Every structure is written in structure tokens, then in C-alpha cells.
């Protein structure tokens, strides 16, 4: 059986870059990894494969939506460190439900008999306020991970995601493994002071702290994971450390996880407003 992770966070938070680097860290520690991009932008696997790969929707359109005519090679690309990537894709902008495609992608992998051949499956999911469609990966996940930055909008989105995880945990096995603090800046952004307080309030922890660093942005534009960058890059080890830390925790015998206790929508405005 595969260990399934669902990675969520506010749009533009660095979720796909973080997901790709977590996948790379896991793969370099010996895990066979599948990363599934669950965003109509279909750029989740770009740092792994170095290109915008064909989406499940595009592949299905080519065979007039006859699932049985597709093989794994039609929808899965292998990239850095042997990581397999799949992009669910979505309908044209302004039409249809992007979340519906996520469930269809999982069904297709199961029909092909490849869903359970991986050690780790990582869903990289669009999710500011989680609708029913984009919450579908939580139905399959062992653990959810939230990517957040040290600001109110990000924390508000993280709290909404905690609500979705709590709701899903009633019927499914999913638990929250923790929050990854992204773009941590102790000189201008307050470090993780607000995230530390939020994590304690909802009953979770910070899995790791990813620094705000030009090298991370540079790797994304290069279409690479950090692990594929020139090993002589200054401060590379500092940037890699949090992803290795996350991978070690995920691959441990029993990762620490819990069902979060989210704050009410109106209450969070009062609570967070008092944090410094």
C-alpha cells in the first residue's frame, strides 16, 4: 500500500515548489514517488520533469474519453530521481469543475493497476477554500500537509483547510501531519511568530521552516528541484535541510499527526488580530 500525502495551501504560497522538493527528498531517500498535480494550471510537476506535461484531461480527449484506450505511459512522465509525475489538468477557464478531474485521475490509475505500486503518492492540490472537488484527495490521504506563510491571509486559508481535514477525518483516515512554514524571513516577515501561535491553537506543529531565499525562486524558473541545482551554489545546504527534514518525518515508522481543531471564521479575526 502506498503512503498518501495531500499538500494544500493558499494560491501563490509556493505549494508546487514545496511539493516537488518534498518529492525529490523522498525519492533520494529511496522511496518510489508519484506526484499528482491537482491544479488546472498543470505546472506542479514542472520542476520534476522540466516541462508542462500532457494532462489526464488532454489524454482522455484524444481517445474520446474511453479510459480503456489509455496506458500509464500516456499520462505519467518520469523525471528527476525517478519520480513519476501526473497532471490532472482541468476544464477550460470559466467552465466545468476542476476538482472533478482529480477523482477521475485516481480512478484511471486504479483501473491501470499502478496506483499501489508507489511507496509515496503526493497530491499537490489547489486550495484556498476547499470545495468538495478539490477536497477529494483527502479521501485517499493518510496525511495532509499545509503550506503557509507568516501572514493573516495565509493563516486564514490554513484554518479553512483545517476545517476540511477535520470534516473528512470523520469518515476517512486522514490526519494533519503539520504546517510547513514557507518563505520564512526573520528580518522583515516576523519569522514564524504568528504561525507558531496558530499551530498551537489548532493542535498541530510546524513540520519545517523553509527560508525565503533567492535560490529557491531561481530553481523554480530553471524547471528544477533544489536537489538538481549546482551543488556549489552558496547556501544550498540551508535550503535543502527543511525538505530533508520533512521527508525523514514522513518516512518514519509512525509520523506524528493529529486531527486539527480549527478556529471559527469570525473568531479567527479577533484572535489573530491580537497576535504579534
Swiss-Prot record:
What is its quaternary makeup?
Homodimer. Protochlorophyllide reductase is composed of three subunits; BchL, BchN and BchB.
Question: What is the catalytic activity of this protein?
Answer: chlorophyllide a + oxidized 2[4Fe-4S]-[ferredoxin] + 2 ADP + 2 phosphate = protochlorophyllide a + reduced 2[4Fe-4S]-[ferredoxin] + 2 ATP + 2 H2O
Q: Which organism is it from?
A: Chlorobaculum tepidum (strain ATCC 49652 / DSM 12025 / NBRC 103806 / TLS)
Q: How is the cofactor bound?
A: Binds 1 [4Fe-4S] cluster per dimer.
Top EC group: oxidoreductase
Q: Which Pfam families match?
A: Fer4_NifH
Q: Which InterPro entries match?
A: NifH/chlL_CS, NifH/frxC, P-loop_NTPase, Protochlorophyllide_ATP-bd
Question: Which HAMAP family does the protein's record reference?
Answer: ChlL_BchL
Q: Name one GO biological process term.
A: light-independent bacteriochlorophyll biosynthetic process
Q: For [4Fe-4S] cluster, which residues are the binding ones?
A: 97, 131
User: Which keywords does this chain's UniProt record carry?
Assistant: 4Fe-4S, ATP-binding, Bacteriochlorophyll biosynthesis, Chlorophyll biosynthesis, Iron, Iron-sulfur, Magnesium, Metal-binding, Nucleotide-binding, Oxidoreductase, Photosynthesis
- Chain's role: Component of the dark-operative protochlorophyllide reductase (DPOR) that uses Mg-ATP and reduced ferredoxin to reduce ring D of protochlorophyllide (Pchlide) to form chlorophyllide a (Chlide). This reaction is light-independent. The L component serves as a unique electron donor to the NB-component of the complex, and binds Mg-ATP.
Q: What is this protein called?
A: Light-independent protochlorophyllide reductase iron-sulfur ATP-binding protein
Copy the pathway line from the protein's UniProt record.
Porphyrin-containing compound metabolism; bacteriochlorophyll biosynthesis (light-independent)
Q: Which residues bind Mg(2+)?
A: 16
Catalytic activity, EC: 1.3.7.7
Cofactor section: [4Fe-4S] cluster
PROSITE patterns according to UniProt: NIFH_FRXC_1, NIFH_FRXC_2, NIFH_FRXC_3
Q: Name one GO molecular function term.
A: metal ion binding
Q: Does the keyword Transmembrane apply?
A: no
